[in-house]
Amino acid sequence: HTFGIDGVTTNPRHIMVSGKPFLTVISEMADWVKAEGIEGYEKFPISVEINPHLDDADEMVAEARKISAICSNFVIKIPCTEAGIQAARRLEAEGIRTNVTLVFSPAQAILPAKNNSLFVSPFIGWKEANGEDCKAYIQAISDIYDNYGYKGKTQIICAAIRTPKQIVD
């Protein structure tokens, strides 16, 4: 892929700032992957976040189904909340891939892996801003995945990256 990029993720706030309607933006993304011939999340995953104001698993699942029907590249980004974990479990059982985000501790990263989520997105910029060791945080999640057989099943995508050093580490 261009520049070695293996996938992308969306952010509702950034889409809102673009001034374009949400469905327009993700439809343009779907058109782009078709034009590039990289259809399918296996080739080029695009994490698309559901409405961040939803707090009901049924509503999350309903919105996720609509979004995933637009493009086979879309992986549904869901918050690591009680309702979000319930929704992710149901979606994965239906074959709709998920990326569980807003993960702030290694313990939170366990349930997405148990539910077979494709990705988990632990926030690191926030952790470092609060004086925590990001490298140790991600290593702890990786160690948990190694210990419980989740490594390779649920991939870790660091989120809220604020500095180049966080990428290198």
Protein language model features and the residues they cover:
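Catalytic beta/alpha-barrel core
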Residues: S47-D56, S72-T81, R97-I110, S121-G131, ...
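Short, charged, surface-exposed secondary-structure boundary motifs
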Residues: V17-K20, Q108-K114, A129-A136
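Short loop-to-alpha-helix "cap/lid" segments that border enzyme active sites
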Residues: E82, E132-Y148
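Catalytic cores of alpha/beta
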Residues: H1-T2, A62-E63, A87, S105-N115, ...
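Active-site beta->alpha loop and helix N-cap motifs at the rims of alpha/beta catalytic domains
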Residues: H1-I5, T10-E94, I124
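C-terminal alpha-helical cap/extension of soluble enzyme domains
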Residues: Y145-D169
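Glycine-rich phosphate-binding active-site loops on the catalytic face of alpha/beta enzymes
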Residues: G7, P12-I15, L102, L118-G131, ...
